[in-house]
Amino acid sequence: KKRFFLLASVVSVALLAMSCSGAQSASEQRECVVTLSGNAYITASPESEPAYIDEGKCEICNWDDEETVVSFHFRAMDKGKMTVALQAKGHSLVEVSLLGKTEEVELASDILTLVEVGTFKVKEPGYIKVDIRGLKINEGESFGNVQSLVVKGNMGPVVCVGGDFSTHFGRRGPSTHMSYTLPEGDVEW
């Protein structure tokens, strides 16, 4: 009985370890939602009336100037192909740039809708920046709202600040994990 229990325990732990390892075939598709809150920043905006991200409402405020750029960031853990879509609402034409390609995307909905941007090749693992800029407001007073990116593909796991993780720590935490080289010699604090 003890041997059977020990064997069953070892097999159970091994199966659990394999299922948590994230191992996948090269052709397996993954999907990840990269939310505005915690993963996006306003990287360009006019000083007179700057746009900003309202974390609580998960929306872009004052997004009515073509100079404003909203940049999403995430990390692809492997190379491969990925399809990017915007979870967005509004009535406008926006420009989406990533991995050396730029696509124009038409937003035409009063409710959040999934709008495909295109398929992109991830040539190597690493951080990916997605810039979104408004080109033309078709209706209303702003370019609308992009609440998240939906990324699908075989580029391995995607790392970003998750919806259940505090955006406070998501925006501030990464700086505590950067490499720091200790100074040589005596140091006085």
Describe each PLM feature range.
Residues 8-17:
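Bacterial N-terminal signal peptides
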Residues 24-189:
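Extracytoplasmic
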Residues 1-9:
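Bacterial N-terminal signal peptides that target proteins for export
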